[in-house]
Curated annotation (Swiss-Prot):
Keywords assigned by UniProt, alphabetized: ANK repeat, Repeat
ANK repeats, residue ranges: 31-71, 72-105, 110-143, 147-181, 185-218, 222-255, 259-297, 300-339, 340-374, 378-413, 414-447
Taxonomic source organism: Acanthamoeba polyphaga mimivirus
SMART domains, per the entry: ANK
Protein name: Putative ankyrin repeat protein L289
Taxonomic superkingdom: Viruses
Length: 544
């Protein structure tokens, strides 16, 4: 049995007072405790004092208040039962029942009875002996609270309890409880356990319920079955083993809820709601292998590929999304149209997500044989939708690819082309996109846009000419800068001629005729020393 560690230390309970707040379980406190309730939570507070004897002594004079309720509607029996393995004891529970404590009183927290409270905590502060004792003294095993939850459901009503209550379930079923009883929401115990089988390590409980005639095909009020919820959460609170068990016991793999959702669509819909792990793909592959089909979903009759595209909103999961599409394309037709006439490519091009792997996914769809020229009910192709979507237009390569494979001048029901829609949303930063669209031969139908395109072409020309002029100016500036640096070098021709002029004026002929100055003399083309002096003097006149 799991060792329960108390949240409260008994020394913190303090002296009794009706208006004081005291804990009545591991996660609840309130006022209006009776003295009996206070004695129950303090039964083991002092190891040198027998707390049970104090309770016995108190009941001799105060038996008529045994069923008193505190601020939250809890009785002394509820407190003792839920804590019979911790602050209180099984013998105190038995004493209270013998003295007339009513096991069927409801508290103010969802009308819970003592049996439900003890059953939901049997692996913690309560125990199985307490359950048996309560039933023996007349606790109603078929009681349901305001939510229609019975004690059987309460074994798993806490979805995050990290323990398995199979022992309690077996006990309750041995008393004749209906294994297929439902809550007000229509949830069976199998549905509840299937949803949390990973959290509670309770795949064995799923197997036990199925072996004992739990029906896996009972839908709840939304039409969702145990297989749907297990498949949806197979990457988090449930697991693939539960999905396999349900299918082994003839769960309908293609059962549809009221929204036409199936187990397959539930997995895909939840693909990005939970942290990704390999169970996403394993569950998908398994369901497809077992015969899951692409059933039109919802009012729009969406295909499974459309659901995958629509539900994806996290750009950081783009790699996983590409893998998902690749898997689905191996088994399902990309050219299926929804009730609006759209294909999965329409939904992709209309997706309002930037930094999305549009190019990779379009390539996958094209490889799978999608027709990019299919029109929806409004006569729009995927390219027309893309030209009306800023997020898509930010991806230049995606636009280029779509223009390449599409009939670029298709006209929709309003008489507009892809270029018309692009110009309706045109911004200067999309000039490069305009160039791509025009390159593939796009033209306008709308007369206003025809004039607009002419103006834009002029602006484009001026823009390019302006860029060329700026580049020319930069080149000229660089030439001037480099020329100055070159001219003032000691070894430059300019500096040598200046030096020769100085030597000539000072009649240092021996320094004029030297190996270092031969290139300068050769440049001047002098035929003798007098001609050289003349040409040096003449040349230096023009050096600034």
């Amino acid at each position: 049995m799991t060792q329960y560690i108390s949240k409260y230390s008994p020394i913190d309970f303090g002296e009794y007072g009706y208006d004081k707040s005291f804990p009545y379980c591991y996660n609840g406190t309130c006022k209006n405790f009776s003295k009996l309730m206070w004695l129950v939570i303090n039964e083991k507070s002092n190891p040198r004092i027998d707390g049970h004897k104090k309770i016995v002594k108190h009941l001799k004079k105060n038996k008529r208040k045994i069923n008193a309720q505190n601020e939250h509607g809890w009785t002394a029996l509820m407190i003792a039962s839920i804590l019979s393995n911790d602050w209180s004891s099984i013998k105190t529970v038995k004493l209270l029942l013998k003295k007339g404590a009513d096991p069927n009183i409801e508290n103010y927290n969802y009308s819970q009875t003592v049996l439900k409270l003890a059953a939901s905590n049997v692996k913690y502060a309560s125990n199985i002996k307490t359950i048996k004792l309560l039933i023996h003294y007349g606790a109603d095993i078929n009681h349901k609270n305001l939510l229609g939850v019975s004690v059987l459901h309460y074994c798993y009503i806490d979805y995050y309890t990290k323990s398995d209550n199979l022992e309690v379930i077996k006990l309750l079923l041995s008393y004749g409880m209906d294994i297929n009883s439902v809550t007000n929401q229509g949830n069976t115990l199998l549905y509840i356990v299937s949803k949390v089988s990973q959290n509670n390590n309770s795949t064995e409980t799923v197997k036990f319920l199925l072996e004992n005639n739990a029906d896996p095909n009972i839908p709840n009020n939304k039409g969702t079955t145990a297989l749907m919820v297990a498949s949806k959460y197979s990457n988090s609170t449930s697991n693939l083993a539960t999905v396999k068990l349900l299918l082994d016991y003839e769960a309908n793999i293609n059962f549809m809820n009221k929204y036409n959702e199936t187990a397959l669509s539930k997995v895909v819909s939840n693909f990005y709601e939970s942290n990704y792990n390999k169970n996403n793909f394993m569950t998908l592959k398994f369901l497809i292998q077992k015969g899951a089909i692409d059933i039109p979903i919802g009012i729009d009759k969406l295909s499974i590929l459309m659901v995958a595209v629509i539900r994806t909103y996290c750009s950081e999961n783009s790699d996983n999304f590409t893998k998902l599409i690749e898997l689905l394309l191996k088994h399902f037709n990309p050219n299926i149209q929804c009730s609006n006439g759209k294909t999965v490519l329409h939904y992709l091009c209309n997706k309002q997500v930037c930094n999305f792997p549009y190019v990779d996914v379009i390539n996958l769809l094209l490889k799978a044989g999608i027709n990019p020229n299919i029109k929806d009910n409004q006569g729009k192709t995927a390219l027309i939708l893309a030209c009306d979507n800023y997020c898509f237009l930010k991806n230049k390569e995606a636009v280029r690819l779509l223009c390449k494979v599409s009939t670029i001048n298709t006209i929709d029901n309003t008489g507009q082309s892809a270029l018309d829609y692009f110009l309706n949303k045109y911004k200067e930063k999309y000039t490069n996109i305009l160039t791509i669209i025009l390159k593939y031969g796009a033209y306008c139908v709308n007369k206003n846009n025809i004039n607009k395109i002419k103006i834009l072409k002029c602006f484009d020309y001026l823009n390019k000419n302006n860029k060329i002029n700026k580049i020319h100016e930069k080149i000229c500036d660089q030439i001037k800068l480099k020329a100055i640096k070159h001219q003032i070098r000691p070894t430059s021709l300019r500096m040598k001629i200046i030096s020769l002029n100085w030597y000539s004026r000072s009649y240092q002929t021996d320094k004029i005729i030297s190996w270092n100055n031969l290139d300068a003399i050769d440049y001047l083309g002098a035929i003798d020393i007098d001609d050289l002096r003349y040409k040096i003097s003449d040349c230096t006149k023009y050096i600034d």
